[in-house]
Amino acid sequence: MPVSGADPKPGLPLPSGPSTPASVQTLAFARDPVGALLSARAAYGPLFTLRFAGVGPVVAIADVDAAVRLMDADPQAARAGEARRRILPQASSRSSFGADADRHRAARGRIESAFAPARIERLDGGLRRLAESHVDHWPMGRPFRMLPRMRTLTQDVFVRLMLGVRDEARAAALVAAMRRLLWTPGNPPLTPPDRDEPGGPLVDAVFRRRLRPVAQLLDEEVRARRGNGTPGDTILDLMVASQPRLSGEEAVDELLVVMAAAQEPPSIALAWLVERLARHPEVAEAFVKAGPGDPVRHAIIDETLRLRPPAMASLRRLTAPFDANGVELPAGTMTMAPIPLLHRDPESFPDAEEFRPARFDGNLNRPEAFRPFGGGARRCIAEPLARAEMHAAIGVVFNRLRVRALWPRPERPVQRATVLVPHRSVPVLTGARLPASPEPAR
């Protein structure tokens, strides 16, 4: 199988797509990614080419069969790490997020057991206690935005439960430093300095400055954990114990990307779930009554992930030709399986724009179209954690509070790097739920 990292050769045709300049397409996609994808599919069918400033042509594969084959393809022939690094230069080639082939398998293998469903299930009590401590400090009777609150919660969960940071001062400092880092404008920068894009160097400079204290705190924790020598099952413990031994710099490099990738999408998913339940009080009531582990809760969570997936797409850069249902895409092509389009496939999800959790009662026409966590060898490693956070945190929120959306119109997704965030960050008004009831354990 020929392997090449080069772009498609000049003259090799790509599928048709919008003819507007790349800068115009980039702006339109950032403002309304779902609308841009739906318009392109309506005009050009399930296979079309978009052009993004600083990235170039990207072929969108919205046919379910072809998209599933792309996600499940040989990782050497369809490289996710290379595609991510092209979009996100901060994605280190040494991390499980930005690596490919053997390096990806090694990086993922080092931390996989920390995300094992059995281990995550044991964290349920800690998840609920952290959620309760955060919800207790939310404003009552005055508006606030839900997304920043959920970011702080997921950062706290990751630092304390997934990394296992026991030093209270260091844990608090790391959560605060991660919060500042993830609030960097454009983070991860859409216009990095190695591309001649306005504002790229400035945005990246802010990102690098806020990155330093996070890296320093992680390095301190790695050193402390190595000095302790006590085995454990947290991500840090597994990295410290890995063979061959990682240098401190290598461990921090991997941790930085894993921290961002394992926190940002779950916090967005939590905010979207609050937004959906605040606009559908009857569904919120069903969520509360169902209790942890009930199929009703699973269905509500899955329908939210279908209609409002945090991830924009599964990205792959081809190193060998790929047959997209009769259309051969050449090696070097940047491709994406756009998750919002897969989740709006009319055959798989009739009346796709309706928020209807009952569709997940086990009778999906094509369950393979539901891909909120991607697929294949690059399926999101943090899926068990994200689902546990949605069950535990949202259970606490709606057992304790009545939540009302401030705006009459639903939030729309906007692009932020490779994720889709609510454009107003979910402004809500909360009041006490009477009588309040504790969230039972799983």
Task: List where the protein language model places each region.
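Cytochrome P450
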Residues: 3-13, 36, 51-59, 80-83, 92-112, 118-129, 138-160, 169-176, ...
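Cytochrome P450 heme-binding "Cys pocket" and the immediately downstream C-terminal segment
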Residues: 383-419
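Conserved cytochrome P450 K-helix/beta-meander segment immediately N-terminal to the heme-binding cysteine loop
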Residues: 337-363
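Conserved cytochrome P450 K-helix E-x-x-R motif and the immediately C-terminal K′/meander segment
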Residues: 25-45, 292-327, 346
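Cytochrome P450 catalytic core segment centered on helix I
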Residues: 3, 14, 177-245
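N-terminal membrane-proximal hinge/A-helix region immediately C-terminal to the signal-anchor transmembrane segment
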Residues: 1-92, 97, 106, 133, ...
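Central I-helix of cytochrome P450 enzymes
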Residues: 154, 158, 211-219, 238-291, ...
